[in-house]
From Swiss-Prot:
Cofactor: heme b
Quaternary organization: The cytochrome bc1 complex contains 11 subunits: 3 respiratory subunits (MT-CYB, CYC1 and UQCRFS1), 2 core proteins (UQCRC1 and UQCRC2) and 6 low-molecular weight proteins (UQCRH/QCR6, UQCRB/QCR7, UQCRQ/QCR8, UQCR10/QCR9, UQCR11/QCR10 and a cleavage product of UQCRFS1). This cytochrome bc1 complex then forms a dimer.
Pfam families noted in UniProt: Cytochrom_B_C, Cytochrome_B
Superkingdom, taxonomy of origin: Eukaryota
Note on how the cofactor is bound: Binds 2 heme b groups non-covalently.
Species: Bos indicus
UniProt name for this protein: Cytochrome b
Further comment: Heme 1 (or BL or b562) is low-potential and absorbs at about 562 nm, and heme 2 (or BH or b566) is high-potential and absorbs at about 566 nm.
Membrane topology: Multi-pass membrane protein
Length: 379
């Protein structure tokens, strides 16, 4: 009799993806973030579902409905803070996952990488719309500033912005549609993530050396299932420490003030995970130029496979490229810091230099380093 795990049409799919999957024997903890992202997504969908049961997407009641969730709903406060801080954990895992892909050359799996870039953009859009829903000051002004950037598009800009707003300013129509999109997008993300996984399993995982591991595979279960469970426990530990001890650490105090179109907060800034892109946007004095730089700062990821010049896949044995990679990480941290600072000297100059360095590292220095390393190895 054949094993049901291997013969049942549905169980067979699960088996081939999570149980009998041949995996490289040497993948490190940097390969844990894929499963952690899956856990984050499920957690966000579940907490979000319970929040949606008590939330009202109307400008007059949105703020008080969130207050009601925190004060009157059973365990509403923990659900709300798990959802808000879960987004932060989601982005930490996302950036680690992308960084791993850059470092170890995983971007040579073109379909998997490009779908990953689409996933990143979709998650960013979802998080942005979610931040608008509590209808605090930063929600309202963040929505106003970011949607208003589209008005920089020549000819159709103004019409486009008013079409997105559903009026002449961010108002009830905007909040309602943002709630609708924020609800549906995570399910779309889940579907795209399945395609991401499908394409990954066509080629199999990369590994730290960047060398084919076909000669040395081990079954996913029990080795990597137990490893993923450990990662999941650490993720939940970190999330719950944040939720129970410092729930507002990563939030903005301005968002505890109800949205007021007549009063602009002194410093409009997005959540911490968008600050690097926000700093690049602000570093260019021209509106359209800033918008293009902002878009390109994320879309540049799609160009990474074309910019790979080295004859080695991974950076494991390429010290020159390693130095530049960590310079890029430091540069992104600098941009994140600058994005949260007011627009004044010396922050403006630091932001401009960090923005130039960001594009210089990716477009010029790293491809050059790859070529130099080939020459040094007489390849």
């Amino acid at each position: 009799m054949t094993n049901i795990r291997k013969s049942h049409p549905l169980m067979k799919i699960v088996n081939n993806a999570f149980i009998d999957l041949p995996a490289p024997s040497n993948i490190s903890s940097w390969w844990n973030f894929g499963s952690l992202l899956g856990i984050c997504l499920i957690l966000q969908i579940l907490t979000g579902l319970f929040l949606a049961m008590h939330y009202t997407s109307d400008t007059t009641t949105a703020f008080s409905s969130v207050t009601h969730i925190c004060r009157d709903v059973n365990y509403g406060w923990i659900i709300r803070y798990m959802h808000a801080n879960g987004a932060s954990m989601f982005f930490i895992c996302l950036y680690m996952h992308v960084g791993r892909g850059l470092y170890y050359g995983s971007y040579t799996f073109l379909e998997t990488w490009n779908i990953g870039v689409i996933l990143l953009l979709t998650v960013m859009a979802t998080a942005f719309m979610g931040y608008v829903l509590p209808w605090g000051q930063m929600s309202f002004w963040g929505a106003t500033v970011i949607t208003n950037l589209l008005s920089a598009i020549p000819y159709i800009g103004t019409n486009l912005v008013e079409w997105i707003w559903g009026g002449f300013s961010v108002d009830k129509a905007t909040l309602t549609r943002f709630f609708a999109f924020h609800f549906i997008l995570p399910f779309i993300i889940m579907a795209i993530a399945m395609v991401h996984l499908l394409f990954l399993h066509e080629t199999g995982s990369n590994n730290p050396t960047g060398i084919s591991s076909d000669v040395d595979k081990i079954p996913f279960h029990p080795y990597y299932t137990i490893k993923d469970i450990l990662g999941a426990l650490l993720l939940i530990l970190a999330l719950m420490l944040l939720v129970l001890f410092a729930p507002d650490l990563l939030g903005d105090p301005d968002n505890y003030t109800p949205a007021n179109p007549l009063n602009t907060p002194p410093h409009i800034k997005p959540e911490w995970y968008f600050l690097f892109a926000y700093a690049i946007l602000r570093s260019i004095p021209n509106k359209l130029g800033g918008v293009l730089a902002l878009a390109f700062s994320i879309l540049i990821l799609a160009l990474i496979p074309l910019l790979h010049t080295s004859k080695q896949r991974s950076m494991m044995f390429r010290p020159l490229s390693q130095c530049l990679f960590w310079a890029l990480v430091a540069d992104l941290l600098t941009l994140t810091w600058i994005g949260g600072q007011p627009v004044e000297h010396p922050y403006i100059t630091i932001g401009q230099l960090a923005s130039i360095l960001y594009f210089l590292l990716i477009l010029v220095l790293m491809p050059t380093a790859g070529t130099v390393e080939n020459k040094l190895l007489k390849w």
